[in-house]
Structure formats: C-alpha cells, structure tokens
C-alpha cells in the first residue's frame, strides 16, 4: 500500500470577510493558523474569547495542490483518507466533490481514483460555520443539554466542550485536525485486526482475527508474528489464527506489577510482496469489572488478572481548546505526572473527543487504567436514521482503533445522561427517552459484541447498571458525588457516604499567580473582576471558594495568599474524601477525582493547570494515593458540625488512625503518634505496631483527647516500615485552622545541590515551597513538627526559594 501524505502546508481562506488568505498547517485548525499568522489575538487572554467566538460564524476553506505519479494511480483502489475533519465539511479534488463529512470523531475515506490525474492536483476542504450549523439544526430538531454550553451543541458530532462547559470557553474551532492522505491499494488491505485472549493454566492463547478489504480475486495471505519483551518470536498465518504464549509476562496497573508489552505484527502478502502491515503493542492480561453481591449491596471494581484493584485517579478532559497544541510530549508529561501522584486510573470524560493513539500508548506504558466514555455528555439526542448511522460508524471506528490497548479498562456509554434523562432534564419528548435506551443499551452493546466482545461495558456514568434504575444508588455501580462543592456541604460530609466507586467528586481552586498573570492585566487581578469571572465558568464559583474559605481560614490580605488558601481548600476537601474511602476498602473500590487537567488557564477543579503546573492538590494526591497510606479520622469541631458560639460544649476530640495497603504484599511497620502544642513540643506520644494484609485496610485503636485543649493542641502521626523508613505522615487539628492558635514557625528555606532544605522552629501546617511555578518537587504543602526537611528538585531550575504556611494566611 502506497501513501501520499497531504499533511503540511495548506492555505486557509475565510470567504466573505476582510481576512486575507493565510498559510495553514495540517493537521491544524482555524484558530491555530490565524494565531500563527498573527491575525487574531490570543483567545485565552482577558476576554478575547468573545471575538474569537464571533469568528466561528464564518465558513472556512482549506486548499492546496499536490503531485500524483503513475505509481500511485496504478492501485486497484485509491482513497482519500481523512482521520479527522472538524466538522461539517465538503471535500473537492480538482473541482469535483468526492465526499462530505459530519462527525469529527470519525475516519472518513472517499474513492478518488477517477478524479486524480498524473502531475499536479488540487484539494479543497470547505467547513461550514459550526455556530450557524447548530443554530439551524436546533431550529429544526430540538436537542437540549448543559446550559454551560451553547444552545444546539447536541446537534453536531463535535467535542461538546468546544461550545463551552463549566470549566471551558466557547471556542468551537474548525479544521483538518488529524492526518490526511491519499492511499493506493494493490489487490487488498488490512481493514482491522482484533485480538482475543484466553488465559488458562499459566498460558495465554491469542486468537487473532484479521479482516481484509479485497479489490481483486488474486490470492493473498496473512502472516502473524508476536515478539515478546525478551525478543522471542511466535508466528502463525491466516486471517483467523492462534498463538500460545508460554510463561506469559502479564501486564499490570501501576503499583501492582510491570507493564511488559508484546509487539503484534500482521502482514498481508501476495506473490512474495508485502501489500500492507498492521503493527501494535499489546499487553497480556484479563480485564473486567467485578460485580458481586455482598453485605453492602453489589461490588464495583476493576479486576485485572483476577485481582480487584482500588482505582485511584482523575478525570481527563481535552488538554487544550486548540487541539493542534496537543502532542505526544505534552500528553506524556501530563500522564507521567498523574502516575507520579500514584494514580493508577484515568477516566476519559465523554464531552470531549477520543484521544490520539499516543495517549493510550502512554497509558499502556505507565500502567494507567483507562475508563473510556463514548463521546456523549449532559444532553439528549434525536435518534434519526441518519444520526444512528453516523454514530454507529463512529463507534466502530474508535472501538477498532483502541480495543487492542492493554490499558483499556472499560467502555462507558455517556457522562451523566442516565441520571438526568431519568429526572426529565432536557427531555422534550418520550421519544428522546426511548432513544436514550436504544443508543446506550442496544446500539453500543451491539457494536461491542461484534468488535470488542471481551470488553466490559457500562451504560453510563453514574449508573447502577442501566434502564434508569436509580443511577446514583450508593450501594452499587458508580456515583458522581457533588454535595460537597455544588451542594455547599462541608468537607466532612464525605465521611457520611461509603459508595462503591466514586467516578466524580471535586473542589475548585485558583491556579497559581503566574498562570493568573498569563490571562489578566494588572487591573483584572481581583477574584470578582470581569476577566477573573470570565475565567471561572462555574457560574458564581469564585464566591463559592470564598464561602468555603470562610469556614476554614482567616481572610487573606492579598490575592497571592487567597490563591494559596484556595489550593489548600481544594486539596483538603479531596483528602477528606479519598482517605475516608480508602479506609473502607472493600466497600468502596474507586476514588477518581474531578479533574486532572485544564484546557485553558482558568479557576477549576484541576490538580494540574493549563500550563502543567502542579497545584497543592496534586502533591496531596501523591500522598493520599500512596500504595500504603496512613490516615486519621479525627473528631472535633468540624466533624461534629458545631461552632465557637456553641461554647461551652461537650466536644469529642479523638484520633483514629488507619493504614490502607493497596499492594500485593503484607505490610508490617510502626505507627508513631504525638499530641503537640503549637510550638511542636510534645504533650503525649506513643506508637502502634502495624500489620496490614495485602489489599486491605486496618484500623488502629481510637484515642480520646477530650480533656485537652481544642485550639492549642494538634495530633501528629507517622508510619514507618520494618526498616524504619518513613512511609507517610500527617497531622490533624480539632478545630478549623482559622481558630487554631498557631505560633510563628519561623520557616526558612535554602537550596543545597538538588535539594531544598526547609527548617521550622514550631508547627508548620501545609508548608508551601515557592521555587518557581514550573518547578516540580518531591513534596510540597506538607506539615512539619519543627525540625528540618529536605525536598528533592525533580523538574525545573530553582533560582530563589521562599516558604510559607497556614500561619501566614491572615
């Protein structure tokens, strides 16, 4: 098979506007090309989004010329292959229309042999205005959805969040966003390859099914090889063949074992000539979701190689509103940062797009389980015959593209639609409710049965199994829990719920000052300014951050301190939830934080901001997602929902340590504890011997401190392994930090080689090392009982360093 790439230099025109034609790059997009040509300002700066949005009321034309030789035209089939057209497009070659597209999530192929000729040819791809299209389509066929997005967004198969979301701007870009090429096929080609695995008696039987597109009656044959990580090779032949792998090296999620990958190659040959080749890496593993009746209801947990895994991870959204900016290097850093925070699971949220192949390749390498939503979110759809045909082709394209990946843990029908459709949200007819059932409980399962029969399918998130059967049932399936944040309940409310698997819960914070400065002018730097609220898409959420801040901290004297306090709020909210659910391992088997990343600079739920900068939450995640975690369920003012005006009160003050072990080995060690004063001097101290079986959690004896002060004592704890090495530590207060009688810890910090050395003379809570926004450290936002702590510089260069703690929030 010969390929003539059409990637590279094109020209972009915007008919009917004063814009002159500009050079364009494919893969690319309208915004990306206009920015490169300096024809529009940065849409992420201040409120430039509004002008950029108006631009999308236009149509757009991409064109170029290209050379074709006789060898390319000699093929038995010559196709134009477009792997991503965003979205409503018509394609002309040499002035003749060859095809139309209506779905950015699909691969489009058009027969072009009859319109090509030797020498110079021209291609034009015309895109309709996405904003006008959804307006016209909505007028003809009402399909409603989230009010954070533009009206009509469900009427187009385009990443929903491009039209706005409660964390993203309204920037519905357009263009040729993935590879485009001419392919010339001799005799036949490989259409797709499916690999099924049967694990039995210490061997893995690989069943390899190859589908061909044949264009002649000539004899062809298929050769298959599997190369193991050690270089050994197994071979077979035929469109349906089997290989038996002896002593297989199994693929495991991060934290449970290695991620060995086998190279599977399928070649199509005729008369000694290779016509086509399909080559991918696969991992040998079993993968499903355990659903068993138990004392709490019905379990829900990823089961890999027979082991039930506690999912520790985050929800992934598109990395950029300008899709051409997403590349393997950027995605690798983001996913490596997820793994660095001890995550083992990533949920690909259903309101964006199906990520590029490299996303899944990296997850395979890192051991990150992928919960894969189909691209439907917070909307209803009208299932016409044309729409059904369109989405079915979308499902087939993407299932075939992704199914071989070791990291693919499950397919999920949609985001949050079962619960909202069940409530009648967005539904304007009973037909739409019936269409919901047909789409997610008939069409998708039918496609998966044919294309990925070994995969686990879940109809929606959240769901209890489908058919509108109590989608948020806490005793089965997965839940999205938002009463903390959207419901304004306190952090401690998480402890009232055990759940089986929490696939969304979150809390917002502001990004760091350097990120805020990237999208604001000096006069904008107030959290209630127009620009700051334009970069806060969750309605009045800046005020919500301050509402929660009022419960926990003194009012900060500067925006910089407010940003710091907001990040602590976010981190501590998630800590309350995750630590609680890990303490109840077995009942709860998943804590997936909303969200991992941002698509533009914004105040949001992300733990890593648009520029890849770690917030406090990401450092906290590194601790509370640790394979072996020591945590403390404290009782005090916050947990008992009281306040200072209830004094004098009978207040329980206690500490109850727990060690959770998400490893395959028994853990033995020692838990050391101490009750201390604000200057970190010890009032009482002691220790517990700790033994925790693999894949379990153990409570240590509860300790009562009701006779000690509420505002001037704190509890500190540390876990050591048998060799005396520190495994984890922390501290808890018996009151809100705003009322604790902190003493100045007299923090100091300096750089020594690749370390930052922090010293404290007293209790320092949530110590933040400021060493540059792009610097990543081995630890940050940690507690100190006085003394000295050395922190490694993992990424970036440090010119100067400063340090602060909760004592400084005033």
Model-found features: residue ranges?
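Glycine- and acidic
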Residues: 249, 342-346, 555-563
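Active-site mouth of glycoside hydrolases
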Residues: 105-106, 126, 160, 170, ...
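Secreted/periplasmic carbohydrate-active enzymes, especially glycoside hydrolases
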Residues: 1-345, 475, 583-584, 613, ...
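Flexible loop residues that form catalytic
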Residues: 128, 185, 351, 416, ...
């Amino acid at each position: 098979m010969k390929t003539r790439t059409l990637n590279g230099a094109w020209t972009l025109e915007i008919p009917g506007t004063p814009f002159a034609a500009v050079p364009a790059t494919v893969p690319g997009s309208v915004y990306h090309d206009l920015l490169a040509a300096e024809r529009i300002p940065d849409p992420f700066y201040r409120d430039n989004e509004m002008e950029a949005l108006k631009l999308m009321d236009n149509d757009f034309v991409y064109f170029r010329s290209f050379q074709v030789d006789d060898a390319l035209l000699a093929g038995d089939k010559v196709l134009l292959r477009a792997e991503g057209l965003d979205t409503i497009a018509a394609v002309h070659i040499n002035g003749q229309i060859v095809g139309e597209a209506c779905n950015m999530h699909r691969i489009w192929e058009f027969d072009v042999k009859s319109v090509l000729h030797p020498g110079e040819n021209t291609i034009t791809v015309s895109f309709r205005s996405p904003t006008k299209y959804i307006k016209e389509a909505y007028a003809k066929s009402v399909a409603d959805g989230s009010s954070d997005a533009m009206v009509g967004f469900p009427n187009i198969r385009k990443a929903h969040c491009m039209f706005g979301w409660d964390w993203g701007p309204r920037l519905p870009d357009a263009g040729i966003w993935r590879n485009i090429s001419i392919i010339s096929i001799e005799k036949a080609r490989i259409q797709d390859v499916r690999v099924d695995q049967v694990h039995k008696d210490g061997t893995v039987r690989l069943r390899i099914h190859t589908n061909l597109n044949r264009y002649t009656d000539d004899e062809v044959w298929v050769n298959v090889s599997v190369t193991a990580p050690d270089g050994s090779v197994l071979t077979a032949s035929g469109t349906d063949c089997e290989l038996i792998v002896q002593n297989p090296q199994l693929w495991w999620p991060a934290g449970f074992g290695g991620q060995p990958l086998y190279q599977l190659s399928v070649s199509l040959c005729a008369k000694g000539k290779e016509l086509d080749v399909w080559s991918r890496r696969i991992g040998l593993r079993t993968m499903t979701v355990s659903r068993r009746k138990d004392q709490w209801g019905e379990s829900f947990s990823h089961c890999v190689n027979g082991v039930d895994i506690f999912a520790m991870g985050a929800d992934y959204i598109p990395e950029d509103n300008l899709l051409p900016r997403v590349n393997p290097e950027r995605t690798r850093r983001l996913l490596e940062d997820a793994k660095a925070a001890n995550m083992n699971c990533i949920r690909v949220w259903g309101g964006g797009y199906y990520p590029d192949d490299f996303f899944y390749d990296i997850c395979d390498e890192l051991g990150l389980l992928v919960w894969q939503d189909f691209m439907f979110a917070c909307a209803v759809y009208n299932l016409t015959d044309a729409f059904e045909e369109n989405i079915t082709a979308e499902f087939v394209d993407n299932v075939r593209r992704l199914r071989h990946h070791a990291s693919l843990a499950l397919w999920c029908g949609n985001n949050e639609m079962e619960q909202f459709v069940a409530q009648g949200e967005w539904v304007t007819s009973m037909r739409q409710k019936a269409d919901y059932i047909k789409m997610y409980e008939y069409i998708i399962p039918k496609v998966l049965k044919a294309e990925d029969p070994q995969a686990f399918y879940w109809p929606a998130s959240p769901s209890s199994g489908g058919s509108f059967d109590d989608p948020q049932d806490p005793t089965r399936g997965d839940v999205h829990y938002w009463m903390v944040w959207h419901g304004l309940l306190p952090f401690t409310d998480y402890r009232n719920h055990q759940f089986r698997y929490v696939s969304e819960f979150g809390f917002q914070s502001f990004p760091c000052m350097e990120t805020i400065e990237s999208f604001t002018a000096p006069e904008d730097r107030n959290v209630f300014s127009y620009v700051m609220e334009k970069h806060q898409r969750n309605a009045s959420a800046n005020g919500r951050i301050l509402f929660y801040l009022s419960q926990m901290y003194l009012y900060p004297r500067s925006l910089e301190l407010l940003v710091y306090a907001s990040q602590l709020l976010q981190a501590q909210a998630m800590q309350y939830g995750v630590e609680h659910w890990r303490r109840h391992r077995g009942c709860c088997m998943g804590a997936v934080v909303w969200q991992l990343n941002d698509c533009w600079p914004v105040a949001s739920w992300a733990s890593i901001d648009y520029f890849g900068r770690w917030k406090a939450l990401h450092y906290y995640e590194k601790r509370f997602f640790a394979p072996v975690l020591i945590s403390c369920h404290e009782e005090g003012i916050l947990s008992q929902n009281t306040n200072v005006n209830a004094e004098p009160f009978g207040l329980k003050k206690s500490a109850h340590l727990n060690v959770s072990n998400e490893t395959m080995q028994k853990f033995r060690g020692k838990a050391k504890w101490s009750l201390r004063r604000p200057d970190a001097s010890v009032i009482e101290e002691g220790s517990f011997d700790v033994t925790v079986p693999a894949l379990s959690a153990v409570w240590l004896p509860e300790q009562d401190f009701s006779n000690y002060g509420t505002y001037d004592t704190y509890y500190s704890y540390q876990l050591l392994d048998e060799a005396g090495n520190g495994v984890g530590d922390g501290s808890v207060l018996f009151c809100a930090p705003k009322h604790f009688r902190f003493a100045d810890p007299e923090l100091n910090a300096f750089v020594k080689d690749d370390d930052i050395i922090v010293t404290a003379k007293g209790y320092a809570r949530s110590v933040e090392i400021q060493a540059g926004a792009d610097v990543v450290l081995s630890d940050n936002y940690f507690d100190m009982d006085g003394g000295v702590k050395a922190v490694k510089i993992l990424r970036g260069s440090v010119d100067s360093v400063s340090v602060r703690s909760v004592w400084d929030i005033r």
